[in-house]
Amino acid sequence: MNLFSTSIISNYWERFPVSLRLIIKARLWTAIGAGGVLYLSPIIFNSLGFTAEQIGSGITIAAFAGITSRFGTGYLLDKKFSYAKAIKAACLVAIVSDFILFYSQNYITYLCGQFFLGTAAGIYWPSAELAVPLNCNNEIKSSEGYSLARSADAIGVTLGVLLGTIGTYFEFARIIYLIDILCMLYIFHILLNNLGISKNEAKIETKDNIEFDIKNS
């Protein structure tokens, strides 16, 4: 028997709740977009003549923005703010960052782009991490949900860096920002149109399981 057959993979994937599958898809596409931006941006701005100090200061600003926005996002999530809305907000901020960095030719715009990039990450990560256990059910442990989510993150980053490397080979390294914009728009689209549907389907699945248990008891 082929352990990697399509049917086995499909059956494994369908074990997870509909809403969790949606979150996993969002994390995969986020990682694809972010992979190239995070790892290849220093190369782009180094080729423009930026010093190591200038590039490092941009990364520092991104980290500082990420820390402060994480605190703010965590506070709002503790106050029952919707993680889906937070992820959509992160997508919009990331798009702003991508536009700035795509057209950036000087140090000031580079710093602005890095600031928005860090802010987007700070909004996204607490929300994306919280979404995993909230969308697990009695049959799926949060540890299994996290393992799938982190696998999607790793695969996405790998694909993102690969696409960016191909773009660099063809002397169009800034394609990483266009890829990230497309990924963010797609994530925004699927969350906007499918999250409500997936929640309803999840409720139906839960209701069916309860009725099945009652009949068997």
Stretch-by-stretch model annotation:
Residues 1-20, 196-217:
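Juxtamembrane intracellular "pre-TM" segments in multi-pass secondary transporters
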Residues 5-63:
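Helix-loop boundary and gating motifs at the non-cytosolic
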Residues 57-75:
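Central cavity-lining transmembrane alpha-helices of secondary-active solute carriers
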Residues 69-82, 168:
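Helix-to-loop junctions at the C-terminal end of transmembrane segments
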Residues 85-99, 181:
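Structural signature of the two symmetry-related core transmembrane helices
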Residues 108-116:
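Paired small-residue
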Residues 115-153:
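Cytoplasmic helix-loop-helix junction between adjacent transmembrane helices
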Residues 175-192:
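Symmetry-related core transmembrane helices of the 12-TM Major Facilitator Superfamily/SLC fold
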